[in-house]
Regions:
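Short alpha-helical segment of the dimerization/phosphotransfer core of two-component systems
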Residues: 22, 75-80
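Conserved micro-motifs of the catalytic ATP-binding
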Residues: 95-100, 141-144
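A residue-level detector for a conserved hydrophobic packing site
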Residues: 80, 149-153
Length: 247
């Protein structure tokens, strides 16, 4: 009868959906595994290039021009290494293959560590950074994956210094209120290009979407923690990112 035919059709549809979901899951797993494999294969030769570049950079027997070129090789190699890390991480976060290793993270010491690592990075150049923490934020403890949260802040800082032709001043502000931790990263540079901001704020990609992998990873990390990442132009000029995390 009609009921029997309907049940048969529903079962058929359910089986088709199940098979389709299996295919999608296998495809996603294959993509994640492929990216992880390629990332792993690139790391070894890249480490050699970086090591040799550093040796040449420090070799006083070489002319200054050659040492300067070696420094450029090191800088670009670091950019490639960061890009590979972001590519691997965004894939894992997208398909739920990146476990969150949550632990108690005290905000004050964590942000001071971010600042110290920024100054130790060659990418910082002559840029400067200051921290402004409220008393509440200083001692606030958030349950988070510290390594991922550090990556999010690193990506914001590297984006800031990497997309400005001259050194910039970066400010990291933090406050805790109403069950939320807010971390703001602002700079006094040229700000986000309009095309980048259109993608970040409204998801408008256009025909030639800008490459915002590093900032997309920031969004994914915050989303994985149940938080948000918002981007805007700073006033009078510069870029501003606001990260929020539930406490």
């Amino acid at each position: 009868g009609f009921a029997g035919e309907l049940a048969e059709k529903l079962n058929e549809t359910g089986e088709q959906l199940r098979r389709r979901n299996e295919i999608i899951a296998r495809r996603d797993t294959a993509r994640t595994d492929w990216i992880a494999g390629v990332s792993h294969d690139i790391r070894t030769p890249l480490a050699l290039i970086l090591g040799w570049g550093e040796q040449l950079q420090q070799d006083e027997a070489l002319p200054a021009a050659a040492r300067q070129k070696a420094a450029g090789i090191c800088t670009q190699s670091e950019k490639i290494r960061s890009l590979i890390g972001d590519l691997n991480l965004t894939s894992k976060l997208q398909y739920g293959a990146q476990p969150l290793r949550r632990k108690a993270v005290t905000v004050g010491p964590f942000l001071r560590r971010c600042a110290a690592e920024f100054y130790e990075s060659p990418a910082a150049g002559d840029s400067t950074l200051e921290l402004e923490l409220t008393q509440a934020a200083e001692h606030t403890v958030v349950q988070a994956d510290e390594a991922l949260l550090l990556r999010a802040i690193e990506n914001l800082l590297h984006n800031t210094v990497g997309h400005n032709a001259v050194p910039v001043h970066v400010t990291i502000r933090a406050d805790a209120a109403d069950g939320m931790l807010t971390i703001q990263v602002t700079d006094d540079g040229q700000g986000y290009p309009p095309a980048v901001l259109a993608v970040l704020q409204a998801g408008e990609t256009g025909e030639n979407p800008p490459h915002i992998l590093g900032l997309h990873v920031v969004e994914q990390i915050l989303a994985a923690h149940g938080g948000t990442a918002a981007f805007a132009q700073a006033l009078p000029h510069g870029a501003a990112a606001a990260l929020t995390l539930p406490l």
